[in-house]
């Protein structure tokens, strides 16, 4: 009888510990994603110090670092990038990496940290350089090129960073790419060059830069 009681007692203790752990984990999970939304660095620091996984996904399958950059919750994003085992090459459902989002938003400090930690600069398809050029973030464009970003990287439909800069970016971004050797003669799957992108976007500065480059190359016999 005594042995039976001891067994029941041990099972009860085990269930109590198991339930307590589950409740604690659920609380930590909720706290983690709430802290990301409000840029609460202190809570994130405490959770990571207790062993919470920085790569935990929310119910929609979104990685905490991607959420932090999108919010933006930049203090939390900086902290998560510094976490020892964080996955810097995690992709969103639409194929965007943390570095791509930082490039799109012009977050140079964050991008520098990720590049130093080995974030993928030349991922297949759309790249961080495409994203930086689409908003004309010259500082990030320079950072990526200095770290061997492929200047004529092609998206799934053949669009290059120069095409994105010509349509959406700044004249400074277009000039930088041309000066660094981007090829204005390339065409995407629709047969459009960077110059035609600029014309479609009614971008007079980009049109002038690209037209001048085209004339020079044709005169030199390079095309």
Enumerate the language-model features and the residues they cover:
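Ankyrin repeat boundary/linker residues
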Residues: 58, 92, 122-125, 155, ...
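N-terminal segments that cap or nucleate solenoid repeat domains
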Residues: 27-63, 67
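Bacterial N-terminal signal peptides
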Residues: 11-21
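Ankyrin repeat A-helix N-terminal signature
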Residues: 34-39, 67-73, 101-107, 131-137, ...
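Ankyrin repeat structural motif
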Residues: 40-48, 73-82, 107-115, 137-146, ...
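Ankyrin-repeat-protein effector appendages
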Residues: 2, 24-31, 147, 180, ...
């Amino acid at each position: 009888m005594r042995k039976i009681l001891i067994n029941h007692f041990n099972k009860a203790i085990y269930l109590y510990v198991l339930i307590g752990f589950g409740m604690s984990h659920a609380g930590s999970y909720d706290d983690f994603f709430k802290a990301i939304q409000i840029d609460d660095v202190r809570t994130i620091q405490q959770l990571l110090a207790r062993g919470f996984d920085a790569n935990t996904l929310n119910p929609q399958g979104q990685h905490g670092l991607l959420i932090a950059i999108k919010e933006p919750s930049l203090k939390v994003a900086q902290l998560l990038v510094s976490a020892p085992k964080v996955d810097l090459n995690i992709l969103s459902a639409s194929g965007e990496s943390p570095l791509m989002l930082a490039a799109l938003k012009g977050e140079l400090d964050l991008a520098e940290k990720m590049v130093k930690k080995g974030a993928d600069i030349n991922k297949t398809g759309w790249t961080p350089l495409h994203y930086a050029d689409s908003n004309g973030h010259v500082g990030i464009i320079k950072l990526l090129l200095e770290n061997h970003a492929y200047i004529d990287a092609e998206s799934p439909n053949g669009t290059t960073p120069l095409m994105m800069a010509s349509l959406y970016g700044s004249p400074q971004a277009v000039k930088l790419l041309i000066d660094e050797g981007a090829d204005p003669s390339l065409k995407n799957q629709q047969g459009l060059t960077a110059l035609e992108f600029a014309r479609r976007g009614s971008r007079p500065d980009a049109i002038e830069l690209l037209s001048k480059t085209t004339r020079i190359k044709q005169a030199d016999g390079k095309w």
